[in-house]
Design a protein with these regions (language model features):
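Glycine-rich catalytic cores of cysteine/serine-nucleophile enzymes that process amide/ester linkages
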Residues: 1-73, 94-105, 120
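Exposed alpha-helical structural elements
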Residues: 6, 81-85, 131, 135
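Short coil/turn linker and secondary-structure boundary residues
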Residues: 74-77, 154
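Sec-exported extracytoplasmic/periplasmic mature domains
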Residues: 87, 91, 116-119
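Activation targets extended, charge/polar-rich intrinsically disordered C-terminal tails
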Residues: 97-177
Length: 177
């Protein structure tokens, strides 16, 4: 079993694998293996969620039995500095538009803000067949906004691929924590 003893230096990514929202599946289809990212600092999970915006949660309230989790570490992380930045943004809304200058933060945007080691990349919204999938066309139609295709942004899979991170554990279940 994995322990929480080295979590203060853990940069955590998680992969949905099973039961997940349509948005989560669309993110994974467009960008890679992951659909969400969070960070564990001093016993708490910090992340930006579509339901609550930027929050700090107890691990028991965060981990879900129908998800698999991969753990990453950034060995050079200044925990105190990252925690100060993480706390500064608590209560910010979720950036549902994924626009670079949208109000609030989406999950990987929040991570890149509090741990500024990641570059932005052109955002993708395709599904392997179309440059913009039907899901994202409808999503942005409902928002009344154009799809921000190729706008600068981040995504969880891109963050996980950073050469600055080390993968510590893969395919962990909620019961492993």
């Amino acid at each position: 079993k994995a322990t929480l003893t080295w979590f203060e230096e853990i940069f955590e990514e998680y992969d949905f694998v099973r039961d997940e929202s349509d948005t989560g599946q669309a993110i994974q289809t467009s960008t890679g293996n992951y659909n969400h990212v969070a960070i564990y600092l001093d016993g708490m999970i910090y992340h930006a969620s579509g339901q609550a915006g930027v929050v700090c949660q107890e691990p028991a309230d965060f981990f879900e039995s129908n998800h698999l989790y991969d753990l990453y570490v950034y060995p050079e992380m200044d925990i105190q500095s990252v925690k100060e930045k993480a706390c500064k943004h608590l209560g910010a809304p979720y950036n549902a538009s994924f626009y670079p200058n949208g109000a609030g933060f989406y999950c990987s945007q929040y991570m890149a803000e509090i741990l500024p080691i990641f570059e932005t990349i052109p955002m993708k919204f395709g599904d392997g067949e179309q440059e913009i999938s039907d899901f994202w066309r409808e999503y942005y139609r409902e928002l009344g906004l154009p799809v921000p295709l190729n706008q600068p942004g981040t995504n969880p899979s891109q963050l996980a691929a950073s050469p600055l991170l080390e993968c510590k554990e893969r395919n962990l279940h909620d019961s492993d924590f």
